[in-house]
Design a protein with these regions (language model features):
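Mature secreted bioactive peptide module from preproproteins
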Residues: 89-181
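N-terminal prepro-regions of secreted/extracellular proteins
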Residues: 1-97
């Protein structure tokens, strides 16, 4: 289901880019950003942020502010200076971290107080955390499900008390991975 939604979205935006002509020449998603009300400088800033995450984490850009992280989850990139990622896919891809956290998910945020770029985690797996400053997280998985925070060697150095739990001011500097179960 996840792969089908991402593939359908990619086809939709590819068709839109092909018809955008010179307008979309600067970025495959420039027309999508324009439709979302972004200025040219905001579009450029957002693309720079997406490019930085792609270089750091890999994956594939599937919308103006969405990165597919190897088929197991998505990253929703907030426009620099904005509290939450915008829905630029008209609901085609759901950010389970905003507004509120969907039941069953662990969400990691780049900023404190559950703001900024978000990584929703559903399937039991190890998820890369790209941030080094303080951010935040919410564990809204099945009651009692414990999330483990792993260092650069993949060793669990801390775990939460189980769902539901959260931290509005979490230090990411030592966390390289979260195993959400």
């Amino acid at each position: 289901m996840f792969a089908v939604a991402v593939a359908a979205l990619a086809l939709t935006f590819s068709a839109g880019v092909a018809s955008a002509g010179a307008e979309g020449a600067t970025s495959p998603y420039a027309s999508q950003a324009k439709q979302a009300g972004l200025t040219a400088s905001q579009t450029s800033a957002l693309q720079n942020e997406v490019d930085r995450y792609l270089a750091q984490m890999g994956g594939k850009q599937v919308a103006a502010n969405v990165i597919d992280l190897g088929g197991k989850n998505l990253m929703f990139v907030a426009l620099p200076g904005e509290a939450h990622p915008r829905d630029m896919t008209k609901g085609a891809l759901v950010d389970h971290c905003w507004p509120g956290v969907t039941d069953g998910y662990f969400c990691a945020y780049a900023g404190g107080n559950f703001t900024g770029t978000s990584i929703p985690m559903y399937n039991c797996a190890r998820y890369r955390i790209p941030w080094t400053a303080n951010g935040s997280w919410i564990n809204n998985q099945t009651i009692g499900t414990v999330a483990n925070f792993l260092d650069d060697s993949g060793v669990s150095r801390w775990h939460d008390g189980g769902a539901y739990s959260d931290d509005a001011d979490a230090p990411w500097y030592w966390v390289h991975w979260v195993k959400n179960c």
